[in-house]
Amino acid sequence: MAAAFEASGALAAVATAMPAEHVAVQVPAPEPTPGPVRILRTAQDLSSPRTRTGDVLLAEPADFESLLLSRPVLEGLRAAGFERPSPVQLKAIPLGRCGLDLIVQAKSGTGKTCVFSTIALDSLVLENLSTQILILAPTREIAVQIHSVITAIGIKMEGLECHVFIGGTPLSQDKTRLKKCHIAVGSPGRIKQLIELDYLNPGSIRLFILDEADKLLEEGSFQEQINWIYSSLPASKQMLAVSATYPEFLANALTKYMRDPTFVRLNSSDPSLIGLKQYYKVVNSYPLAHKVFEEKTQHLQELFSRIPFNQALVFSNLHSRAQHLADILSSKGFPAECISGNMNQNQRLDAMAKLKHFHCRVLISTDLTSRGIDAEKVNLVVNLDVPLDWETYMHRIGRAGRFGTLGLTVTYCCRGEEENMMMRIAQKCNINLLPLPDPIPSGLMEECVDWDVEVKAAVHTYGIASVPNQPLKKQIQKIERTLQIQKAHGDHMASSRNNSVSGLSVKSKNNTKQKLPVKSHSECGIIEKATSPKELGCDRQSEEQMKNSVQTPVENSTNSQHQVKEALPVSLPQIPCLSSFKIHQPYTLTFAELVEDYEHYIKEGLEKPVEIIRHYTGPGDQTVNPQNGFVRNKVIEQRVPVLASSSQSGDSESDSDSYSSRTSSQSKGNKSYLEGSSDNQLKDSESTPVDDRISLEQPPNGSDTPNPEKYQESPGIQMKTRLKEGASQRAKQSRRNLPRRSSFRLQTEAQEDDWYDCHREIRLSFSDTYQDYEEYWRAYYRAWQEYYAAASHSYYWNAQRHPSWMAAYHMNTIYLQEMMHSNQ
């Protein structure tokens, strides 16, 4: 299956990349003179040899000069590839230039974008720098495409300023562009926002255009935003509404926005394109949705392997299913991209650029690209799911057969409900829907490679220069000649040792002096040109003649022939999956870089305004934004003499170190906990030791003063006892003067009252106690840091090298403290 797809990809001039071991070979002779270079032609170029239908051809030939357009617009149309107008262009452009309100309906891909672009450019006053024309589109991709068409046609108009305003871009950039903008193209949401912020002045708008008007004015879609924008525009303006489909209710509703509108409707009873063959395939229905998806995917792979095509669009009704299908096709050897509404703006624009520049063969999409997207190389459209309405179906299949060309559409539907829905759509649109033949014949696609395309592989910005342009025939000849020369050269070396040198070996030695530099396929973009079937047949004949003519007495052995036959399939162009075009460089991130990347994704990746109110930077620094209801707490370390004596015993030193490490993490990593409950703080300061260990979480053991007899082991512990006794006495005095509040009440009050009352009591009753208590344990923490700073313990340095371990330790400490706090 994949091999057949690769063969069709070679016919459709897919961008291919060959491994380095097959490219870096010895060249025996100079290359022959290359043939004429084919020119890339656009879909609207009627002079190309592509087949055209009556959708774009006129009974009597006409040109744009007969429309009395300005000279810069005529030159721009010619430069953009528009040589002769289509029927809708010939009828609508003169009416629009007269200032009439128009409702234009024509088939997909017949030049409707060129209609309003030409009208807009011809009515523009370049000396007036204010915004004169406003164009709205339902999706960002359509807005970007309209902007590209206007700039292409207006290339000869000096000083033209046309900008696109869509979501996902900074408002500051839009504000700067609107200072000098003749034509504003955008989505309804962003345009409304710009008007509300007074960045866009609607009073200067003279022409208001709705592209895909049926979608913009659909109830529950953009109707409220369109009404708001329309009400802010001046009354004396011209309005154009353009679309391929118009439901009956919408045609009547549009008259409310316009003054005596003129209808330009071509083939309203037959909206399907003449050059499109429409097929459907009924698949088995299963209770589980993933079983249906698997069967449709298998049929899709079979379709790709049997039908040669230039590019294909596959539509799905679900976002998740589209991404999953793209992954499956890429893993099977079919290069596929995905685009959907849940992707960010950069990813969506990148996928569209790859489709239009022929950097991907298959694009899996939702209905995001079903309207207005113009990719002239697409000649196959597949509906993996039946669309929900007939308008969506007509817009989907309109992505193929652009500007009167030929194309093919296939719709997969399950037996039962989906099949009945597809039949209703066919009856509503009056289309000739045929069942897909089984097996699929090879000649189902009438037009596959009978027009010229130029394909370029995606080149990375950090890549190296690409390989020179070489046709497929020359590459095969190079590979064969190289294998023959290598074989002859090996025989020559063997014969030279036996003092028998043949003429062929001498010739091969002279020819092997030229070498091709080694380049991998990831560093090179190999450019291929499409050839006609006749040329491919000539190539095969020339290959066979070359095989018969280059055989020498040295190469008559069966081993050499077998080697050439085995090397040929490997040397043929392969179609790698899309991931092979991307260079994945190994890179190790630190914990700080991971945190920075995560915060960048949270703030910008989701396209939502997100403000980070708390930054955790370590055990000694907790930075909080005071504007969000918190207080910026930062431990200010002061130099205090070390209280612990160096003559402490090993057991007491270990106890003090373990206690100090726990307390330092509590006082610095979770300072709010130490200040949260006055009762718990009193109990922690008055706790008695158990088994020669001290713990802040232990409840009081009956008395408020600790037993001094258990602390006679070292002077450091005596100092600790005196500090704790003084702290408890001051706490008793403060408790007699102030009303006592229970910890349970502090936890159950409202958040603001709890925060202010709790901190007011702490400041009044424990200011001195907490200061001495904090200074004491800060000295222990400083001593612990100074001790390990001078040590060369590998575990400590590993902990410093991997701060994620320390972060996990502190987070776990806070979590345990909160659990114990709630239990108390």
From Swiss-Prot:
Enzyme class label: hydrolase
Main location per the UniProt record: cytoplasm
Keywords in alphabetical order: ATP-binding, Cytoplasm, DNA-binding, Helicase, Hydrolase, mRNA processing, mRNA splicing, Nucleotide-binding, Nucleus, Phosphoprotein
Renumbered residue ranges of the record's region SMN interacting: 456-548
Origin: domain of life: Eukaryota
Binding residues for ATP: 84, 89, 109-114
Annotated ranges, domain Helicase ATP-binding: 93-264
Protein name: Probable ATP-dependent RNA helicase DDX20
Organism, scientific name: Homo sapiens (Human)
